[in-house]
Amino acid sequence: MITRERLVEEFALLDEKATLLASWGVIPEEITLYLIGGGNLALRGIKDATADVDVVVENVRVLGFLDEVLTNPSPELKVGPGVRVIYVKKVEHKYKVKLGAVSVYRKLDPEMRDFNMDVFVKRVLRGLILSEGMKNRSVLPSEFEDFKTLRVRLVSLEDIFLFKGVTSLGRAKDIDDLLRLLEHGVDFEVMLGELNNQGMIIGPERFEWLVGLLYEKLLILRKVLAEKGLRSRALDKFIKELGLSFV
């Protein structure tokens, strides 16, 4: 599992490597990544650790630059305590391909255990699209403010809620994360606004299917809360508004 401390350390090493590559003119002076999923929650301290790190980039061109940072094996690219940071691109990874990841990388580290990174281009899990609203709501955490080349931004908790809300109903860990987000506090009005936006940029059939997934997952979430003797009026209102507006 990847802890918050490991996340910060690994991205710091990647920024050093990216800065060296930028100084050679191999990549641009700035690359923006959007951290979603469990890595985002771990960095915020909302969960202890995550199995892998999910990142979204804006286009294939940025993916190419990030690929260079992750996989370039040059011995001159030593960072931190004189080490080389090299990831292996996992092309044949059926589970991740099924989810729609464009590229899956793994850093083999016998001392600190593996570090897995899934990189999506614009669209996540063949579902929601990284919109201008999502980018505008994202924040640059203090841990990454001093980076020179990588701009690792955290998408909002509301957008994480939506990303996790439209995954397969069988992903139990997403229900756990949705409970954490609900406990931490999210703005359902922001989510309704983003859903309206997604409805305009995603094809109607696909959008209807995604909203159906979200609706079913929210019903499961409400049932889990009820089994714990809990209730969220805000969640109830969101489910009702979702049903009236989209389902």
Feature map (PLM): residue ranges:
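Compositionally biased terminal segments of proteins
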Residues: M1-V247
